[in-house]
Amino acid sequence: MGVKKVALACTVCGSRNYYVAENKNRTERLELNKYCKHCGQYAQHKETR
């Protein structure tokens, strides 16, 4: 069985730039400041399912 992955979507433009492995121990959604190549800036990315 493979690892289920979830996307990290940019809050500015909405593009899904990063994918991370899902962790069952984490109940809240992940939020990270990452670089968005579409916006050209560092922006907050939120976990989508």
Swiss-Prot record:
Gene Ontology biological-process entries: translation
Name assigned to this protein? Large ribosomal subunit protein bL33B
Give the HAMAP family listed for this entry. Ribosomal_bL33 (MF_00294)
For molecular function, the Gene Ontology terms on record are: structural constituent of ribosome
Give GO cellular component annotations, separated by semicolons. cytoplasm; ribonucleoprotein complex; ribosome
Q: Which family does it belong to?
A: Belongs to the bacterial ribosomal protein bL33 family.
Q: Give the source's domain of life in one word.
A: Bacteria
Q: Which Pfam families match?
A: Ribosomal_L33
What keywords is this UniProt entry annotated with?
Ribonucleoprotein, Ribosomal protein
